[in-house]
């Protein structure tokens, strides 16, 4: 039995080498080491025949997964990104959790929540395992060593063994007085981040130091606060609660590459940096707009502001006790979180050009060093708002809208 040591770590589930989930990685950095393409061609478009509130997940093999909300028929879909969006399989999940996206592992298994359960699917549509949880899981996160972090909108945090689907350690409940039998309570408040949904956004995790950060809007409190936990020896332990952002935080937090700093939007129209060890404020910088999606972050410390209506596109550098403005584009309205690919390419979805009397949407390719436009590609017939940009390890770029339209570009 001595031969059964840690050499079998390759069989443990880990994030796919693509864009495994919304915001790219467990830290929510929206960054990939893949060098992004600047010249793209629109290869295919397709509709989920419903709505979307989370971005596409991309596996290393070119599979694409979407958690749609549809009036009938399939809602969770897996398509072939490199084959004109051809459907591989689809199933119908319990509806109401569209704000949470699926997660791919390196074996093309999928992990996704529905109200009251977390489910894993193999590369075919048959269920690998399904386990009950209290509430609706947000986009899951890998913790390393085949462990999965599941955080629900009602404040339950659990760690699962991805192979067997069993809970490891003890769950942590961040919100008191929750009815465990009502998995859908407050779900309608999650996408707009209103107080009825205590945990409206996915947590951030750093594998460097085991830090988990999640935003929690406790019942009866005026605003959402950040809560910090440590994952150690297969157990989550609550470490701190921060009210540094007194106006409340909005959207998922983002952890720096070294796990030392949390970046988050404030409802006070500022970008905040907090110490990940204790939740104390390091600095805040005025954005001049309300960012409704998380910032993006390179390993070298460039921070690109989140998106939303009436925004600009702005970048900062963390100078320790203050932020230095890197550049700002007031001429574009960034509607989604930027996705940063390698050293020299960023993507976001912006408003315009106008089309048939509607505002229209375009995929903007920009240089993160200075914000300059490299290319711009209109999204034909796009309506609603964008739900993010995903960058595959084959350099294909996929974006989608809240009205269920999916656009796939190739270099």
UniProtKB/Swiss-Prot annotation:
InterPro entries from the UniProt entry: PQQ_rpt_dom, Quinoprotein_ADH-like_sf, WD40/YVTN_repeat-like_dom_sf
Pfam families documented for this protein: PQQ_2 (PF13360)
UniProt protein name: Protein Rv3035
Protein species of origin: Mycobacterium tuberculosis (strain ATCC 25618 / H37Rv)
């Amino acid at each position: 039995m001595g031969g059964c040591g840690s050499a079998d770590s390759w069989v443990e589930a880990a994030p796919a080498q693509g864009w495994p989930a919304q915001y790219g990685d467990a830290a929510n950095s929206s960054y990939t080491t893949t060098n992004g393409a600047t010249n793209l061609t629109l290869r295919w478009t397709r509709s989920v025949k419903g709505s979307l509130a989370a971005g596409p997940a991309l596996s290393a093999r070119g599979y694409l997964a979407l958690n749609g909300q549809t009036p009938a028929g399939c809602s969770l879909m897996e398509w072939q990104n490199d084959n004109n969006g051809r459907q591989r399989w689809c199933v119908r999940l319990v509806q109401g959790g569209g704000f949470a996206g699926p997660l791919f592992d390196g074996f093309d298994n999928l992990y996704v929540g529905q109200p009251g359960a977390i489910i894993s699917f193999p590369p075919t549509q048959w269920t690998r395992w399904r386990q009950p949880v209290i509430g609706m899981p947000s986009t899951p996160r890998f913790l390393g060593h085949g462990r999965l972090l599941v955080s629900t909108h009602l404040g339950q945090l659990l760690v699962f063994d991805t192979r067997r689907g069993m809970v490891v350690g003890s769950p942590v409940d961040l919100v008191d007085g929750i009815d465990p039998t009502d998995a859908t309570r407050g779900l309608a408040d999650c996408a707009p981040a209103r107080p009825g949904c205590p945990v409206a956004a996915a947590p951030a995790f750093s594998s460097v130091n085991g830090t988990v950060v999640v935003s929690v809007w406790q019942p009866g409190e005026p605003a959402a606060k950040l809560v910090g936990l440590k994952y150690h020896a297969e157990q989550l332990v609550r470490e701190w609660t921060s009210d540094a952002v007194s106006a409340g935080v909005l959207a998922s937090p983002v952890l720096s590459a070294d796990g030392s700093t949390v970046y988050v939007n404030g409802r006070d129209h500022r970008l905040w940096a907090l110490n990940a060890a204790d939740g104390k404020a390091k600095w805040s910088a005025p954005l001049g707009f309300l960012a409704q999606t998380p910032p993006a972050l390179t390993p070298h410390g460039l921070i690109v502001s989140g998106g939303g209506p009436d925004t600009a596109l702005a970048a900062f550098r963390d100078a320790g006790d203050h932020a230095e403005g890197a550049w700002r584009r007031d001429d574009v309205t960034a509607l989604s979180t930027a996705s940063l690919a390698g050293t020299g390419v960023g993507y976001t979805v912006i408003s315009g050009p106008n089309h048939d009397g509607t505002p229209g949407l375009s995929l903007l390719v920009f240089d993160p060093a200075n914000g300059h436009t490299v290319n711009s590609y209109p999204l034909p017939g796009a309506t609603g708002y964008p739900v993010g940009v995903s960058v595959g390890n084959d350099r294909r770029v996929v974006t989608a809208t809240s009205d269920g339209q999916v656009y796939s570009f190739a270099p």
